[in-house]
Amino acid sequence: MTAFSKHRWRGPVIRRPKTTFGAFLLLFWTWWALLAVFRAFPGIDIYFSQLFFLGTDCDATAAAGSICGGFPYRDSGNFDLLRTIFFRLPYVVAIVMAWKLIECYQQHGATFNAERARKLKVGLGALLIGPVLLVNVILKEHWGRPRPVQTDIFGGALHFVEAGSLAGKCVSNCSFVSGEAASAGWLFCLLLFVPKSLRYALVPPVAAISILTPAMRLSFGAHYLSDVTLGWLSSLVVFAALLALTESQQHQKNSEI
């Protein structure tokens, strides 16, 4: 055996976080790293939106130098129906979870399932803090980034601004970040709580919906790649944060017993 074979290069080792808090930190800094990449290279957003944009000849009333056209998938009835179903699905799931949580607290003593109640509270809390509060109330209402269909490079009237910029002129319900992608990311997180007996049946369709939802928003010209990526990932960050918080509280209670 040669010295070379004894010391064979094995390549970089990717280590998974050992704790939930470690997973939260990894996801948190990944979110900021991706935002930095999208801000430094705004052409990424423009390129991927151009893949779904179909330019047309402008009519005589258009100003010189105008870009005319649209996003064909936006006008598809089938895709719009699919988008509506995917949009409502997370909130239907949330209603069922709230009902199950009420059922949990109707039990007392030995019949009360504390772990199940904790998981339901984490799931519902992540939806309220992430997609509802952080994304729809704070980011989309105050960051002012125009959607692709609103920008002049895709036939709109407003100027393009990069991800995270506050310089945009969108007034309300803006592009940064995608609320539907955030809800899809939240739905994906719930797979952590799926019993093993149901995983083979539920994981493929839920994962597919979680990916197709942001992909459709991109193809409709409703969001840029950065909007759907960061929106989707934001739910994972919030979910991991709440899991880490509740686990630390549970460990503290156990240590006091």
Swiss-Prot record:
InterPro entries associated with the record: P_Acid_Pase_2/haloperoxi_sf, P_Acid_Pase_2/haloperoxidase
SMART domains hit by this protein: acidPPc (SM00014)
Protein's membrane topology: Multi-pass membrane protein
Bilayer-spanning residue ranges: 21-41, 85-105, 119-139, 174-194, 201-221, 225-245
Pfam families reported in the protein's UniProt record: PAP2 (PF01569)
GO molecular function, one term: hydrolase activity
Consequence of gene loss (knockout): Lipid A contains a monophosphate group at position 4' instead of the usual galacturonic acid moiety. No longer has 4'-dephosphorylase activity on Kdo(2)-lipid IV(A). Increased sensitivity to the cationic antimicrobial peptide (CAMP) polymyxin B (PMB) but not to other several other antibiotics. A double lpxE-lpxF mutant contains lipid A bi-phosphorylated at positions 1- and 4'- and has greater sensitivity to PMB than either single mutant. No visible effect on free-living bacteria, or on nitrogen fixation upon nodulation of P.vulgaris.
UniProt EC number: 3.1.-.-
Top EC class of this enzyme: hydrolase
Entry superkingdom: Bacteria
Alphabetized UniProt keyword annotations: Antibiotic resistance, Cell inner membrane, Cell membrane, Hydrolase, Lipid A biosynthesis, Lipid biosynthesis, Lipid metabolism, Lipopolysaccharide biosynthesis, Membrane, Transmembrane, Transmembrane helix
Biological pathway: Bacterial outer membrane biogenesis; LPS lipid A biosynthesis
Function (record text): Probably removes the 4'-phosphate moiety from lipid A species. Not seen to act on other membrane components, nor does it dephosphorylate the 1-phosphate group of lipid A and/or lipid A precursors.
Protein name stated in the entry: Lipid A 4'-phosphatase
Lineage: Bacteria, Pseudomonadati, Pseudomonadota, Alphaproteobacteria, Hyphomicrobiales
Gene that encodes the chain: lpxf
